Amino acid sequence: MIEWQDLHHSELSVSQLYALLQLRCAVFVVEQNCPYQDIDGDDLTGDNRHILGWKNDELVAYARILKSDDDLEPVVIGRVIVSEALRGEKVGQQLMSKTLETCTHHWPDKPVYLGAQAHLQNFYQSFGFIPVTEVYEEDGIPHIGMAREVIQA
């Protein structure tokens, strides 16, 4: 069973921040062989939030939600990760459901954007995202911009 947390950046403990940065580095930098500066200055600003999934005290799933100060900009989901050990167990679906619940709870009138790795386009489409850009390369990996309009309850 995965325990989920939805935390404003100001609620993150040092150990939670360390765990999320460690998981992001393990997947995006090491596993995907993509050397880039992951710590981009957006983790601890504004109304940004972090979705963390824990199993046996280990961080196994994570997503970051960026809320721009510009009210005309969409909410942006990024850094979506499931640890290698739990892939194929539908943890990604749980993570996206929790992440979108957070977006709807905190910003019910805001569309949502994400830059998806292109091979995950169908996964994100299953959550109501549609492509809004052509495929582009980011850090040597094909990506596609996708958006989800406001869903009225």
UniProtKB/Swiss-Prot annotation:
InterPro entries: Acyl_CoA_acyltransferase, GNAT_dom. It comes from the Bacteria. CDD domains: NAT_SF (cd04301). Residues 7-151 form the N-acetyltransferase domain. SUPFAM superfamilies: Acyl-CoA N-acyltransferases (Nat). One of its GO terms (molecular function) is N-acetyltransferase activity. Pfam families: Acetyltransf_10. Coiled coil: none annotated. Belongs to the UPF0039 (ElaA) family. This is Protein ElaA. The lineage of its organism: Bacteria, Pseudomonadati, Pseudomonadota, Gammaproteobacteria, Enterobacterales. The gene is elaA.
